[in-house]
Amino acid sequence: MDCVKIESGTSLLRVFHAAPQAPAVDVYINEKLVFSNLQFTQFSSYVKLKEGEYRIDIFQTGTMLQPIISGSLDLDEGQMLTIAAIGNLDDLSLLVINDNADKKASPKVSSFRVVHLSPNTPAVDILVNNKILVESLAFKQNTSYVDIAPGSYNIEAVLNSNKESVLVFGAVLKTNRIYTIYIVGESPNLRGIQSVDGNTYLCRY
């Protein structure tokens, strides 16, 4: 596919529905419908926004009586962001995740990171093929991007407290790709959602 350019004075933003108890949602930015009928574990496409201040309101699909989540965003130029709807119904919020527009895809290696978005799962250690990547990753935290040889990997989350395995996810990681693996859902029914991040496709000239 053609590369994507972040134009001067703008940024790119997408929304990820990661709230396991929440219904399908419509996303309004500054009172304008931007994404509709976004289901749990679904991503929107990236949209271009000018730098500035924005209000984000998330409604149950087809309604506009009361947003289930509202938040504000002060957007600088040159960013690439994922806005995740997270939490349980009694404590929903928006989490801004920086997709790091400076990170470049490589023809020699793959890159990935892990984000913990399960609201009822304590801090976890992340193992890659049984080797520790990071310890005590808490809800709403993410690892840094890690470069790794392309191939198939078992990515496992174990509770930091007692080393109980709570998720094993099989990931296929390719060259020229930058991925995020999101831990979503509620224990004991966790899921791994693998995303190719938009920084994979940014123009580099």
Where are these regions (language model features)?
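Intrinsically disordered, low-complexity polar regions and short flexible loop motifs
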Residues: M1-Y205
